[in-house]
Amino acid sequence: MIYNLPHLKNREAVLLTAAIEYLHVNANGINFRVAVSGPPDGPVILCLHGFPEGSMSWRQFMQLMPQARIYAPDLRGYPGTDQPRGGYDVFTLTDDVKALIEALNLDRPLLLTHDWGGAIGWIFAHRYSPLIRRLVVVNCTHTKTLVRAVFHVTDWQPFRIPWVPFFELPWIPEAFITSSLGRKLLRWSFTSREGQKGTMNREVVDEMVARFQKSSDIKPIIDYYRQMVSTHFTPRKRAKLYDVYKTPISVPVTLVWGMEDGALSSKVAFKSGDDAGCEVEIRPLPGVGHFVDLEASEKLAQEVTRLL
């Protein structure tokens, strides 16, 4: 398939797109689809996408980083990867990342994460810092910092993410999102959040939204939210997670932030280092919204190149 990429001439787009291939990898008991690009001897980057995205979210970034060996899996429960009934808690999700690193035989990759991938990335780095050489988080507050802000209503944080309580309802969110109206709203939820009008890659947005045709297509990824809420309201699970936070992250951390993010407060996010237990380098991107990977991949590529 040839993709019409903004800021790239058609010929360049064709050549670069051809460099991406897909692998199917068994890890932690399920099969993952993994997009791969770049030379085998290049610096290694492992990318974790956000909600409700997929490996295609990283496509343009991968095309702008021909010097790096990049792996971008579709996470557990997303179309292309197995969708088991369970395993959507953060402990299993971080174990998935560990298993992928081992199955792909990656030697301490740079872990690049966005949104829900960032939540997984923060917790993964607390648990498994020795497996990576650096954590880069794009528009995702440290999970402990974010939960505290929700409970304390810091900078109106709970009102910025109204879909979280909606997702606690049984079956209704799945039925609505996969309706014709719901898919239109889902598309709008991407395009309405760009920092500057017209900068988001609409073709990739359409590709992502089109995957959700029936409730079973999206239930697993809504379960990410349900399991996170359950973890914080179940004393045993919450204690287990907060024990994980006691181990400081021991690799360098960079937080790249699209400053026009309406869902996550930068005022809250920039305090993430307090809960990470380490210094966090903050790299603000003025004029960029939440979906940095879809609307400012050139800027993101520049930030990551600086860290290789």
Spans of model-derived segments:
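Conserved acidic functional residues
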Residues: 50, 115, 294-295
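Active-site pre-Tyr helix/loop in NAD(P)-dependent dehydrogenases
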Residues: 51, 141, 291
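Short acidic-hydrophobic surface loop/beta-edge motif
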Residues: 21-27
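Catalytic histidine-centered segment of alpha/beta-hydrolase-like enzymes
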Residues: 288-297
